[in-house]
């Protein structure tokens, strides 16, 4: 079966690359065998494609052999040596520009290894890294932000209100010292500068929900600045907005809550409070100042013993107090008439997100028919929904559970001193838990006494005000 003239011409074109490659590096067996003779039958499309691919591979192999024969042996080795040097220089340059991307130190690697071995698998998704030193801090981080970050990392600031106020005051200093680069405007570049400060703070400790809401407010105010304003005018306007936020959403809101919650305290009440809440403390002190007679039960828990701060403050104002640990809660609950709790945040489904142990106290109060009153400012309300405290939480260092001393100045390691070297021993310290809305009798905010399920309505109302 013969070929036509057109088919022979087409085959000649297909064979031309093979002849060129064979002239460079010699004819390989694969190339020679791939030539189609006139007596062979016509190939299908799939077979022709495979044949063409084999010819290309043979051509590349022949060129590579020819190049290897022409180049001396030392050239390729020199190129191989030069490439790592180039990459190492790029890595050094990148590490100088951004110290966070520099190679990890032995201490960091050791800490990471220990954590991975001692990690509770169900909480492996939670961030555990904490920057507790000033090592490898980016050069654009403001000293005031570094100071705040170290305080947050070492748990020197108690309460979400105080953390938010300190954050906004720190950003006031950052804005005052900020200089707009040439070719940009304040409203366009300041947000980038603020983002780098926030990234450093997040590396020291996860931001609270109240801090996140305050940051969103600040970024919104920066974005709506008039582009025609001078830098000094824009800074002055931002500083006024920050002062207004602290005054209206935190301080005055707390004062309104104090007035509303005090009305719920009657003479002869036994009020139970947990750990240290600045809003609840203000409620109890104000009730004492207006002449109401009551007693307070301060419930505390390890490892930070924040309840001692509350106990000291209340006793200084002449309030009769009883101090118990959370393990004795069931014995003291029969005396309690009302429970006042502070809130880290109020979730959109009406749940209370607060310090670990709050849910236990609310449950015992609900079962004992004791009203549970949550005091929380509206700037802590969030659209987030949580059904448990597993998906989102904050991991505290396990070393906090080692010290068995009764105060911060007593070091008493106890049996957990060498817990990192004990096989199959893991320590878990969670900061927060979630109290379902059915356990909360009423939520007191600056809008009044409301059911906890009204959180979405309050959020929408404030969105319209600040839109």
Swiss-Prot record:
Keywords: Cytoplasm, Initiation factor, Phosphoprotein, Protein biosynthesis. Its main location: cytoplasm. Residues 1-106 are annotated as: Disordered. It is found in: Cytoplasm, Cytosol. Residues 16-37 have a biased composition (Polar residues). GO terms for molecular function: guanyl-nucleotide exchange factor activity; translation initiation factor activity. GO terms for biological process: cytoplasmic translational initiation. GO terms for cellular component: cytosol; eukaryotic translation initiation factor 2B complex. The modification Phosphoserine is found at residues 16, 19, 21, 23, 28, 37. The modification Phosphothreonine is found at residue 27. Residues 84-102 have a biased composition (Low complexity). The keyword Magnesium does not apply. Component of the translation initiation factor 2B (eIF2B) complex which is a heterodecamer of two sets of five different subunits: alpha, beta, gamma, delta and epsilon. Subunits alpha, beta and delta comprise a regulatory subcomplex and subunits epsilon and gamma comprise a catalytic subcomplex. Within the complex, the hexameric regulatory complex resides at the center, with the two heterodimeric catalytic subcomplexes bound on opposite sides. Belongs to the eIF-2B alpha/beta/delta subunits family. This is Translation initiation factor eIF2B subunit delta. It comes from Schizosaccharomyces pombe (strain 972 / ATCC 24843). The gene is tif224.
């Amino acid at each position: 079966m013969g070929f036509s003239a057109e088919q022979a011409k087409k085959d000649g074109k297909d064979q031309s690359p093979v002849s060129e490659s064979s002239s460079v590096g010699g004819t390989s067996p694969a190339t020679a065998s791939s030539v189609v003779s006139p007596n062979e039958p016509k190939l299908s499309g799939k077979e022709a494609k495979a044949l063409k691919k084999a010819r290309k591979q043979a051509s590349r192999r022949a060129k590579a052999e020819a190049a290897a024969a022409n180049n001396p042996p030392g050239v390729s080795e020199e190129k191989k040596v030069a490439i790592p040097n180039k990459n190492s220089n790029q890595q050094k340059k990148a590490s100088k520009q951004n110290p966070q991307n520099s190679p990890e130190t032995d201490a960091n690697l050791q800490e990471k290894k220990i954590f991975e071995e001692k990690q509770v698998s169900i909480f492996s998704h939670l961030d555990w890294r904490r920057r507790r030193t000033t090592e490898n801090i980016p050069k654009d981080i403001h000293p005031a932000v570094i100071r705040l970050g170290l305080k947050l990392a070492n748990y020197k600031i108690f309460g979400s209100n105080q953390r938010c106020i300190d954050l906004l005051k720190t950003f006031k200093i950052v804005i005052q010292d900020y200089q707009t680069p040439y070719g940009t405007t304040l409203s366009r570049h300041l947000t980038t500068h603020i983002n780098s400060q926030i990234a450093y703070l997040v590396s020291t400790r996860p931001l609270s929900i109240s801090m996140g809401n305050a940051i969103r407010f600040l970024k919104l105010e920066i974005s709506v600045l008039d582009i025609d304003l001078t830098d000094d005018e824009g800074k002055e306007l931002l500083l006024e907005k920050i002062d207004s936020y602290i005054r209206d959403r935190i301080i005055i809101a707390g004062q309104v809550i104090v007035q509303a919650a005090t009305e719920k305290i009657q003479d002869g009440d036994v009020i139970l409070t947990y750990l240290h809440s600045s809003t609840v403390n203000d409620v109890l002190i104000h009730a004492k100042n207006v002449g109401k007679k009551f007693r307070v039960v301060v419930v505390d828990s390890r490892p930070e013993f924040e309840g001692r701060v509350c106990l000291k403050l209340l006793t200084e104002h002449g309030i009769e107090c009883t101090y118990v640990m959370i393990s004795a809660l069931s014995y003291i609950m029969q005396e309690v008439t009302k429970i006042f709790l502070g809130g880290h945040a109020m979730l959109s489904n009406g749940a209370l997100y607060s310090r670990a142990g709050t849910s236990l106290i609310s449950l015992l109060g609900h079962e004992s028919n004791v009203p549970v009153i949550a005091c929380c400012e509206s700037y802590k309300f969030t659209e987030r929904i949580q059904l448990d405290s597993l998906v989102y939480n904050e991991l505290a260092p396990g070393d906090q559970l080692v010290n068995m001393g009764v105060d911060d100045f007593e070091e008493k390691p106890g049996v957990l001193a060498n817990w990192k070297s004990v096989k199959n021993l893991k320590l878990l310290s969670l900061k927060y838990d979630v109290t379902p809305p059915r356990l909360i009798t009423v939520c007191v905010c600056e809008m009044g006494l409301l059911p906890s399920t009204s959180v979405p309505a309050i959020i929408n109302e404030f969105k319209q005000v600040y839109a």
